[in-house]
């Protein structure tokens, strides 16, 4: 029930595919990142400090506090969405196609950032993606779904070396860039 779920919600956060539509255009970066902290009944100084820490973690300057989503690039917006999730110090981060709306250079930067954050903060990810190149670069284990059915589940290395289903083989083949 709702009462039992409430404490668990702080343990996980989600970052959506399209950072522009997931950010409120009326809130600046500071308000966006700090919004969830308001529920924690923290002192203003601590909220401010945690916002600064979150910006630093995602490699955005403190000066971005006053910017609005329309003033940011796609990669910067995705970093704000990550900071908004990280500021609550979750144990699990659900990443729903977090790089699909970004160009390849920005994708690589976000994947590198996600790897660093995972190592530094011991965060687990559920990474949802159709881009197997990004999955290969970031994930340790892969669960392949087809029409809500589990096709296979194994280490990323084994999945790419020895896929167990024809469907997975086709996905891998289709993801190879010429």
Indicate where each model-derived feature is located.
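A short, proline-enriched helix->beta-strand linker immediately N-terminal to the Walker B motif
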Residues: 87-91
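Conserved ABC ATPase "signature" region
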Residues: 38, 45-63, 172-173
């Amino acid at each position: 029930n709702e009462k039992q779920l409430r404490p668990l919600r702080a343990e996980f956060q989600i970052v959506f595919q399209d950072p522009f539509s997931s950010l409120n255009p009326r809130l600046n970066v500071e308000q966006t990142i700090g919004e969830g902290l308001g529920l924690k009944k923290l002192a203003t100084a601590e909220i401010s400090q945690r916002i600064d820490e979150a910006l630093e973690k995602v490699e955005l300057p403190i000066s971005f506090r006053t910017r609005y989503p329309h003033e940011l690039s796609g990669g910067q917006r995705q970093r704000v969405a990550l900071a908004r999730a990280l500021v609550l110090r979750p144990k699990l981060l659900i990443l729903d196609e977090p790089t699909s709306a970004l160009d390849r250079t920005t994708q690589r930067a976000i994947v590198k950032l996600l790897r660093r954050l995972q190592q530094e903060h011991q965060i687990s990810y559920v990474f949802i993606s159709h881009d197997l190149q990004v999955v290969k670069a970031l994930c340790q284990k892969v669960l392949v779904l087809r029409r809500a059915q589990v096709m296979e589940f194994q280490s990323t290395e084994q999945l790419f070396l020895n896929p167990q289903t024809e469907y997975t083989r086709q996905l891998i083949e289709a993801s190879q860039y010429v």
